[in-house]
Each structure stands twice: as C-alpha cells, then as structure tokens.
C-alpha cells in the first residue's frame, strides 16, 4: 500500500487541495529547517496573510529535525523512531471545519483506508475538552478515551499566539511484546504508540497568558509516514519497515556484514542520514562551515564515522543515493533529475573527511587512554578544528562508552578563537516586521498591485505612509524619509535575486528602495515636497530597470545553458541581478574548464541571436510543475505562480524581463569561482555593461602593452617568466643550503615544513644524513602546492602520507614507500595540511 498516496487521495476526496511539500529550508527566520507539516501554513494560522481558497489543504511534508531547537540527531540509530528526515502527513482547515470533521476524517482513514484493528486503537483528549471527548465517543468506546493535562494535550505555536487543545490517536502494539513499567496509556513505554496528533487551534494567548477564543478556529494535524508504515506492516521499529530495510540491505552489501537489530545502530544511522543528505543537497543546501550547511556536514560525518565502524574506509555514502532515488524518486522527481550531481557533491565531501578521519581517531584513542570520565575539551576542539570532527560526533563516540566531553572548555576555545560564528536565525528584518503596522495595512487594503510588468510610469494613489519605525502617519514632510504604500505601484520590490527599483515620485521625491513586507510593496522615499495619504502622485521608475531586466533574462538563459552543457542535475543555488551585472550560483562539484565556459557563453549568445518574444503565464502551481517549469527550492510560492518562457527556458519567476531576447544584445562571462563545497558561481555582463566591459578590457590591455614596452604582449610575458624562473633557481640553490631543524620521537627524527628549494634533493640529503627519518616538505609554485615525502626505517609509507595530504589540498598523488610526491591546488589549506601531516607522523611513530 502506498500510504502517502492513499492519504492525499482520501483528503482530496473530502474537498482538500493537495499541496506539494514545501522546501526543507523554510521562509521563516526563526527556523533552521522545516520540521513539521504546519510550518508552510504558519502565517495563515497567525493571520499574517489571508486564508487561502479553498481553506482546507492536505500535504505530505518533508521535514528535517537536526540542529536548532528540534534536534533528534543524537538519538538516531539508537531508538526505534527517531529520524533526522521524515515525512509528515497532514490535513489543515483554516477556519472552515473543526473538531467534528477532523475527528471523523481521522477515524475513517485509520479504520477504513488503513484498516487498522479498532480494538488496538486508543485516543487522548485534553482534560477540559468535553467537546472532543463527546465527539470521539461516537466512534470509539469511552473507556478507550483518556484525558490528560496541558503537558500532553495542549499545543501552542509559541509563548503567545494561536494555541489549543489537541487529541492524539494511539495504537496498542501488544501486551505480549511490551510489558514494562512504562507500558501503559500515558507512559513512556513503546506499547502504546502515538500515530496521529489532531490540534484544535481555538484560542489566542496574550502576553499575560490569558486565552481568548479565535473567531475562526482551525485544524492542524500531523501523522508520521514512517511510524504509520511500521504499524501497517506489523513491525516494531520504523527501521524494520519497507521505508528503511532496502537502505539497510544496501549497507550490508557495501560492508559485507549481516545486519542484526541489536547491534545494528550504525546501519540505522547510515540509512537515516543518507535520506537527509540526499534531500538537502537536492534542494540546494551545500556543505559549509556554518548554518544549515554545517548541519549537513555534521550529518554526513556522523554517518561516515559509523561506516568506519563497519569497515567502510573509502567513500560509500554517495553510492546509496541510487537507493534513495529508487525508493522515493517516483514521488519526488527532482531527486532523479539531480541524482548524479548529488552523488558527486557527497563523494567530494566524503573524500575530504576520510582524508583526516584516521589521524583524528588516532588522536581520540590516545587521549581516551588518559581519560577517566570527562574527555579533554582542548582535544575535542583540536579534533573539531584540525580534523573536522563536529563536537556532537566526539560526544557520540564517548556516549557509546559511558563518558562525556568537557563542553564548557570546548565552548571557551570556540569563543576565544572565533573559529565558527554561530548562525543567527533572527535578523533585524524580523524585528521590523514585529514592530511595524504591516498587519493592519494588510487587513485594511489587502496586497497592493504591482503594475511594473506593463509600465514604468503610473499615476497612483498613496494608501498609507509609514515612518522610519514603520508606524502609520498621515503625512511625510519635505526633507524626511519614510515608506509609501501605493494602490498600484510600478516599483519592483527586491525579490528572487533581482534588485529593487528606484525612481521618482512627483518628479523630485526620490524612491531609494522598494521592499515587500507581508505581501505589501512599499517604497522608501526621500521627500523634497510634502506627501499625504490620499494624494494622487506621478511615479516613474529609473531607466536602470531596463538594464536590470536584460541581466535577469540573461540569467535564465545561462541557467538553461548550464543544464544543457553540464547536465540536468545542475540546480540554481542563488542569483543576484542588477543593471551592471549578474551573478548565478549553481550546484556543481568542480570548477569549470575554459572550454566549458566558452561553450556556455556561446550557448547563451546563440539563444540571444535567435531572438523570440518572452511569454508569461499565471498558472496553478501543480500545473506549472507538470508543464516542466523549473522552480527554486529556496523560494516560497503561492497557489498561483508566474511562469516565464524565454526561448527554450521555462521557469517560475516574478521578476521583470525583456520583451524579446534580442534586447539582451550580447553576453560575456567575467568570472567563474567556487562559493562553497559543491556550489560554483558565474559572474557575467550583458547589453551596455558588456560593451563597457569590452572597452575597459581593451584599455587595460593597452596599458599592459605600454608597461611591457611591446606590442607582442605574449612574447614579452614569456620572456619575463623565463627570467623569474632563473631567479627562482638561484633562490632554490640558496635555500637548499639552509639547515633544517628536526624533531624526534621514539628514536625517529621527523620534519614537516614549507621549503623553497628543491624538495627531492633536500629529502635525499636528510635520508643520507639520518638512519631513521620521516620528512615531508611543501612548496608553492605556479599557483599550486607541491608535496614530497621521504621515509627511511620508520613505520610509515611515503605514498600513503602524500595521498592523504593531497586530499586536503584538493589534489592527488602517490609513489613508493620510501619516496612519493603529490600536488594540490587549494593553497588556503597549507597550514591545515602541515598540522595534519605532523599529527599523522606523531601518531604513527
């Protein structure tokens, strides 16, 4: 049985509109990830936005609980039901139906569609909710209805705001299997398993804690797909269900060891974590040093450590992406489109961590030998800072053997060195929204209309004026700054990567910014004359908008070119367009070659030269997705979306664009670079900006020729390079004569250092002078890092040393046991590589 489909179809038959799963990265600054089915509807429940039509919805929402307030990461693998990634089935009513229907629907679905045994079902209600009790009594015997207090059966969105009693449905897994002290209704045992929570949002709580009835009570329900699947299949752990067992079997094949539930925590960790990793990367989250990207990194590194316990010491997680796509690609088709890109990104990150995990574990074991109960915070920090071990990974390893880490000392070192800035998810923008009069304006006027697609000039009425504190005022005096709400505005509010419009009101009042607050398009104005609410004013958008539109359209063509040349797995990770340039971030695991960049540039210019009118359509979101239009996961869309077609490009977009591709003129790539692991960036110019760029380039090239005193720049540069090479050789000879300081441990001398001279000659010299030695040298030359290692009568292999070091530096290499060389291109990580090599040698000798 496809429970996901059965659930959605059931509620669709009851008049609910099926809503696609919202992005895992929510449009909510207070949340790290979407962690519940109601998150996409939060602003509807709070009244911040009008209720939709129809006001009843159903969804299967993908959720992440790792990091932030809701963090299940530490428990995953060790319990039957904790997950970092899960799917939440839900039905929602925004002031339409209430308890009677919600309870009836839930009972019908569970007993008639899922056909769960009625004799194994129990429900709970709030101790004061007589209404819910009486409704349930129509469906189930009263002795199966339990009353509990606020702790168990009252739900609140926060300290203030919408809240209400809830009712939970439980399934009895059997006294014959569960008979512990906590295995009773209301206990913490596993016998009675909660499967569905029905929240009756009927009150508003104020700051004093007082409850007042909501004018239109709402319904929010949630049922975990993994949990109900396990019950339906008659297994006691979610991990024993058809959702996880194919992944666990895949891990068995990789490690060659059979899975046993009692000792299978590592299998379960890997099976859970690969789902989170796959979905997050598919939706544009990438490995990073902070924020969501760092949570993603923690999840992968935790899985790799558990893989290490199973004997998996080479990259393996990326191979499991195929299994996730096979299991879930039929419902989430974007997984199939991005599968190969996801695999490459994961593999690259695996290689980074696996290059240091061995030495990190050696350091961990060495410190463990000196640990009684509490593991050193200093060593935990070193594991984190040098070897990439997240603190919770170290804590996880210690928990398995009954020890703890000194987190206080770890935090102290973090603060001292400021190695990682904690991501803050509540910005100043949210404070503005909290104190502003936006909600009142929305209730009074609704969303004001943007007419800038058709015109850059208008006569509009001032509906409202806000001062700098975003409070309503009747008038803005000359010489002041404030925000104006027009009934119809030609000014584009910054969104979707496109910069805001500027312009003039009544010829002399400068529009300096335009932003959107709760659906309201507001323009910031520096006044030279008085402006009053009710005034009819002339509005004019700056000409810069025309160039911005050209760059925005070029961005769409670039996206199409990238997908055609690099593969359909390429996804947009961000963009920024203005009148002077465009910037496009996209998921791709490696830097682009000059040949690829030329192909991309030619592709875009070819699309421009073909011309063709742009086309926009307002479509139902599900219809738009089916039509092949591309959407961005990080954007939040309504029920209706604007779909833009430019030649072969078709995307969701609310921005302004050219009417015909010819208007773009020409397109030129200025720069390609890396943003973070698995994310690349292209910066480009078009139209007038491209012409200006060409002029500046010609001028700079002329200056180069003048500086070289030659019209043949290439030959002059070659001559200079030869002279530099000759000078470097002289420096190298001088460096080779320098005395090298050696360290010693257990009778073996060793050195790890940067060296300007001939590193092979120096290693040979040291090996001739010493009976037992390990030498590793780094040399920067021509934008790359050269690595050489020499070993004589020591328990290390030079080939293995350079191989691991090169991974840190983004390169590769190898060689004999006594001598080996390698290269790398990431010069920013030389210090990390030096420290790693030094620790590796110390651990081995």
Swiss-Prot record:
Gene3D superfamilies: 2.40.30.130, 3.10.310.40, 3.30.54.20, Bira Bifunctional Protein, Domain 2, Threonyl-trna Synthetase, Chain A, domain 2. Its EC number is 6.1.1.7. Zn(2+) binds at residues 552, 556, 653, 657. GO terms for molecular function: alanine-tRNA ligase activity; aminoacyl-tRNA deacylase activity; ATP binding; tRNA binding; zinc ion binding. Keywords: Aminoacyl-tRNA synthetase, ATP-binding, Cytoplasm, Ligase, Metal-binding, Nucleotide-binding, Protein biosynthesis, RNA-binding, tRNA-binding, Zinc. It is an enzyme of class 6 (ligase). One of its GO terms (biological process) is alanyl-tRNA aminoacylation. It is found in: Cytoplasm. Binds 1 zinc ion per subunit. GO terms for cellular component: cytosol. The keyword Aminoacyl-tRNA synthetase applies. It catalyses: tRNA(Ala) + L-alanine + ATP = L-alanyl-tRNA(Ala) + AMP + diphosphate. It comes from the Bacteria. The keyword 4Fe-4S does not apply. InterPro entries: aa-tRNA-synth_II/BPL/LPL, Ala-tRNA-lgiase_IIc, Ala-tRNA-ligase_IIc_anticod-bd, Ala-tRNA-synth_IIc_core, Ala-tRNA-synth_IIc_N, Ala-tRNA_ligase, Ala_tRNA_ligase_euk/bac, DHHA1_dom. Its cofactor is Zn(2+). Transmembrane segments: none annotated. Its main location: cytoplasm. Belongs to the class-II aminoacyl-tRNA synthetase family. PANTHER family: ALANINE--TRNA LIGASE, CYTOPLASMIC, ALANYL-TRNA SYNTHETASE. Consists of three domains; the N-terminal catalytic domain, the editing domain and the C-terminal C-Ala domain. The editing domain removes incorrectly charged amino acids, while the C-Ala domain, along with tRNA(Ala), serves as a bridge to cooperatively bring together the editing and aminoacylation centers thus stimulating deacylation of misacylated tRNAs. Catalyzes the attachment of alanine to tRNA(Ala) in a two-step reaction: alanine is first activated by ATP to form Ala-AMP and then transferred to the acceptor end of tRNA(Ala). Also edits incorrectly charged Ser-tRNA(Ala) and Gly-tRNA(Ala) via its editing domain. HAMAP family: Ala_tRNA_synth_B (MF_00036_B). This is Alanine--tRNA ligase. It comes from Campylobacter hominis (strain ATCC BAA-381 / DSM 21671 / CCUG 45161 / LMG 19568 / NCTC 13146 / CH001A). The lineage of its organism: Bacteria, Pseudomonadati, Campylobacterota, Epsilonproteobacteria, Campylobacterales. The gene is alaS.
